[in-house]
């Protein structure tokens, strides 16, 4: 079972896996642990990751990047419209109103959804993990920003389904970092002590996030989160790009924004300059050759100028920090440490701002790039039964308050209830009780739309169906379980109706029914039961309302009854009571049955099953096309490699092993094949390259074999000669009556001599025949035949010459007629020669009175 953590970022991705030795971040086929979030489309296949990044400038229109923030958003979203202006590829609306990405693929115009694009990236990450683990990858944990809304999270899950990944949990970035930070710490307080407060701050390419966490041994709880979704390292790059665009326009009369390729090159150079300024405070140059119109451009900047240019962005860093302190009611001294991760935290000014706010130095104990992926892998290992991990519970926080609105039964007024407040523990479930006579709707929405970085506050509409009134006409009690699950997604998981069914029982049972009925009747004064059930099982606590319900359903005996009536009467009094009192009529007992109700969900964003299946089928076809194209390219490269290899060696080591006529013929074939490769064979089917390779190998293989045989044959013949000399010497020693071999039977040694003579004669004949042949002729014997002879010789001779000598038994010691041999120590211990027991010695085993054995140890 695979345990994989995927950090899918807007600019790059990291993969962490769990092994027996711990968590490891794995590398891709380029030996790089960072895989760019870039996908390039070509006429034959897709290119994903490093290879796509390398051709981003040359294939700008068909190379897709920075698409993570498009999840779950409509094309009309203001954020999409703003981002559209700075992209090198086209965004168009989909039929469902979502964002579509238009590219040229397989020489045709294709429209892909954001889920499909992310699925393509996940396909690459999955392939990299499988190549590293050498087994299929299915289960994983994927990271998302903590400010992702319900629609965005559902969109990411759909992308994982397209590629066949079972996402065990969508984990918030900072929660993953906190898990990676806390699980290895040994100085955490015990569970019953005051938790240790720590802050986790992440500043990546596209956003700034910070979380306050409480740590105990084996426990992590996120107290609150704050963020700026539009403050990332990319914004600092944009400031540099704007500055140099203005400078080049004034200095060189060049408008970099008019050409997308020039703008992309400037973006790359500005990113490099920003990284250099993080470690150097002096003036640093920016040089780009042939920038536009065959003109070279140059400029320079230092760190102080950069900080002055980005002063507005640096001021925004403190806003989420202040917000976090207000939400959690913490003081800066309550935060014992602040761990920072993300590429943008390497900017010295960013570190200084964070350290100044908290009044302490920031901590950089974690790998700033890989911390999120490692935290996701740890969470996956905790959830997986295949790994035994230290117990560590993770309680996340709901980033936005969620409310429910519904119509009352009269349909004249609406009821609103905030079911999950900001920073409420998650995953978490609550049970709401409604009194209804028919089906009703619940609408979930974010209570604070201004604080949500998403234009739509609505989450979805849920219809509870098959609700009916009780048989007596009263309203039915409907229990609705609302939940924020492990992915941070709001849902109505179940709904049930409490139905009363009258049954007839004996007198004792009817008394029990009378006791239960009042407590089971829902309160008419409140439409929603304020004592709603809260299921904290996933957060580590026990459900409370189940206990409360048990206490209310079983009423205690009334204290007004005299104590004698609580006693069990004797048989005579019971018989008298039966005779005196007339039989009472049977009272109906109310039996309570919970009926499960279907819930229809109409969500703001969720791919339909048919559309999802179509995307899965499309992705499968593209994966197969990529595989076929890779095999075709491999076959083509094999032909090209063969041409270059034989051409170089025919004028070198292979020259002696081919005749002049064949040499000229083979060279002509190599030249013709090379010309064919770059002309007619530039784009051929896989089989055409296989046929060409077979044609080349038909002429080249014999030459290659002759060369290899000439290199290996002397070594193998020398080995055979050494074995023959070894066995011949042993036979000679046997004939000279050497004591070492006098135990070997005469007939056995004759077999050795016969085998040695036969193999020696064969070797002499082969060597004489080979000496008469030239190097450009096929050899008389192959090296594998000589090795077979060596093996055959060893099989015959080794069992004979390695026969062990029989062991010679030493003569038994003679005992003196007068008693034991006093020269031998063992005769003085244990029993003597006549069977008498020796006296007990210290350190010996001897039976005690009960017959058991006592061990006296020195």
Curated annotation (Swiss-Prot):
Domain of life: Eukaryota
Modified residues (N6-acetyllysine): 471
CDD domains cross-referenced by the UniProt entry: ASKHA_NBD_HSP70_HSPH1
Cellular component aspect of the GO annotation: cytosol; nucleus
Modified residues (Phosphoserine): 509-510, 558, 810
One Pfam family recorded for the sequence: HSP70
GO terms (BP aspect): cellular response to heat
Annotated SUPFAM superfamilies: Actin-like ATPase domain, Heat shock protein 70kD (HSP70), C-terminal subdomain, Heat shock protein 70kD (HSP70), peptide-binding domain
Keywords attached to this entry: Acetylation, ATP-binding, Cytoplasm, Nucleotide-binding, Phosphoprotein, Stress response
Residues recorded with modification N-acetylserine: 2
Compartment(s) where it occurs, according to its Swiss-Prot or TrEMBL record: Cytoplasm
Role: Acts as a nucleotide-exchange factor (NEF) for chaperone proteins HSPA1A and HSPA1B, promoting the release of ADP from HSPA1A/B thereby triggering substrate release. Prevents the aggregation of denatured proteins in cells under severe stress, on which the ATP levels decrease markedly. Inhibits HSPA8/HSC70 ATPase and chaperone activities.
Subunit structure: Interacts with HSPA8/HSC70. Interacts with HSPA1A (via NBD) and HSPA1B (via NBD).
Similarity-based family: Belongs to the heat shock protein 70 family.
Protein name: Heat shock protein 105 kDa
């Amino acid at each position: 079972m695979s345990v994989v953590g995927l950090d899918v970022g807007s600019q790059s991705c990291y993969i962490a896996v769990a092994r027996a030795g711990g968590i490891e971040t794995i590398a891709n086929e380029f030996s790089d642990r960072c895989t760019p979030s870039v996908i390039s489309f070509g006429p034959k296949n897709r290119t994903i990751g490093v290879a796509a990044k390398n051709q981003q400038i040359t294939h700008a229109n068909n190379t897709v990047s920075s698409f993570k923030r498009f999840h779950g958003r409509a094309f009309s979203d203001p954020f999409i419209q703003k981002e559209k202006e700075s992209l090198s590829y086209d965004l168009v609306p989909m039929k469902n109103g979502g964002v579509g990405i238009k590219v040229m693929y397989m020489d045709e115009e294709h429209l892909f959804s954001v889920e499909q694009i992310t699925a393509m990236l996940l396909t690459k990450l999955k392939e990299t993990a499988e190549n590293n683990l050498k087994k299929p990858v299915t289960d994983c944990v994927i990271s998302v920003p903590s400010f992702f809304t319900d629609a965005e999270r559902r969109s990411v899950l759909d992308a994982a389904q397209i590629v066949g990944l079972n996402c065990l949990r969508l984990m918030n970035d900072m929660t993953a970092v906190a898990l990676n930070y806390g699980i290895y710490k040994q100085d955490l307080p015990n569970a019953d002590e005051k938790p240790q407060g720590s802050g986790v701050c992440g500043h990546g390419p596209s956003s700034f996030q910070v979380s306050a966490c409480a740590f105990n041994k084996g426990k992590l709880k996120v107290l609150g989160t704050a963020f700026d979704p539009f403050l990332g390292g990319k914004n600092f790059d944009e400031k540099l790009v704007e500055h140099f665009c203005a400078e080049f326009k004034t200095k060189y009369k060049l408008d970099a924004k008019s050409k997308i390729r020039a703008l992309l090159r400037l973006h790359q150079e500005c990113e490099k300059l920003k990284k250099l300024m993080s470690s150097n405070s002096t003036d640093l140059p920016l040089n780009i050759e042939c920038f536009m119109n065959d003109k070279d451009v140059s400029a320079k900047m230092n760190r102080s100028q950069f900080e002055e240019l980005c002063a507005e962005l640096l001021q925004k860093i403190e806003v989420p920090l202040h917000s976090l302190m207000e939400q959690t009611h913490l003081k800066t001294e309550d935060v014992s440490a602040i761990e920072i991760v993300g590429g943008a935290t390497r900017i010295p000014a960013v570190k200084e701002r964070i350290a100044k706010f908290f009044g302490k130095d920031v901590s950089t104990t974690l790998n700033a790039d890989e911390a999120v992926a490692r935290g996701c892998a740890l969470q996956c290992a905790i959830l997986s039964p295949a790994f035994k991990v230290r117990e560590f519970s993770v309680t996340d926080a709901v980033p936005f308050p969620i409310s429910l609105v519904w119509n009352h039964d009269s349909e004249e007024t609406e009821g609103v209830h905030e079911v999950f407040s900001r920073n409420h523990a998650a995953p978490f479930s609550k049970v709401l009780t409604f009194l209804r006579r028919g089906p009703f709707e619940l609408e979930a929405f974010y209570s604070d739309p201004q604080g949500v970085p998403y234009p739509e506050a609505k989450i979805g509409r849920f219809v509870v169906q098959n609700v009916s009134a009780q048989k007596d006409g009263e309203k039915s009690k409907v229990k609705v379980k609302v939940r924020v699950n492990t992915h941070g997604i709001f849902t109505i998981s179940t709904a049930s109706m409490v139905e009363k069914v009258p049954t007839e029982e004996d007198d004792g049972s009817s008394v029990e029914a009378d006791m239960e009925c009042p407590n089971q009747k829902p309160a008419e004064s409140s439409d929603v039961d304020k004592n709603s059930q809260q299921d904290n099982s996933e957060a580590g606590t026990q459900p409370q309302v189940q206990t409360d319900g048990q206490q209310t359903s079983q009423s205690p005996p009334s204290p007004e009854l005299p104590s004698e009536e609580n006693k069990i009467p004797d048989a005579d009094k019971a018989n008298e009571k039966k005779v005196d009192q007339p039989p009472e009529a049977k009272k109906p007992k109310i039996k309570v049955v919970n009926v499960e109700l279907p819930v229809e969900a109409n969500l703001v964003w969720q791919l339909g099953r048919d559309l999802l299946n179509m995307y899965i089928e499309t992705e499968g076809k593209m994966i197969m096309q990529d595989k076929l194209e890779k095999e075709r390219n491999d076959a083509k490269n094999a032909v090209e490699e063969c041409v270059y290899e034989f051409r170089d060696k025919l004028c070198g080591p292979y020259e002696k092993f081919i005749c002049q006529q064949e040499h000229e013929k083979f060279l002509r074939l190599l030249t013709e094949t090379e010309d064919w490769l770059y002309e007619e064979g530039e784009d051929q089917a896989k089989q055409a390259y296989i046929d060409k390779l077979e044609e080349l190998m038909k002429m080249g293989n014999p030459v290659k074999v002759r060369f290899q045989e000439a290199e290996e044959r002397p070594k193998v013949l020398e080995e055979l000669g050494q074995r023959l000399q070894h066995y011949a010497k042993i036979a000679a020693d046997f004939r000279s009556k050497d004591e070492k071999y006098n135990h070997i039977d005469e007939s056995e040694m004759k077999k050795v001599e016969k085998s040695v003579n036969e193999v020696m004669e064969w070797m002499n004949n082969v060597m004489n025949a080979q000496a008469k042949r030239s190097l450009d002729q096929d050899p008389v014997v192959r090296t594998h035949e000589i090795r077979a002879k060596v093996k055959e010789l060893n099989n015959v001779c080794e069992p004979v010459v390695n026969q062990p000598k029989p062991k010679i038994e030493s003569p038994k010691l003679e005992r003196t007629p007068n008693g034991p041999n006093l020269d031998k120590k063992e005769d003085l211990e244990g029993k003597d020669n006549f069977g008498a027991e020796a006296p007990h010695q210290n350190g010996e085993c001897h039976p005690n009175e009960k017959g058991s054995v006592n061990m006296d140890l020195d």
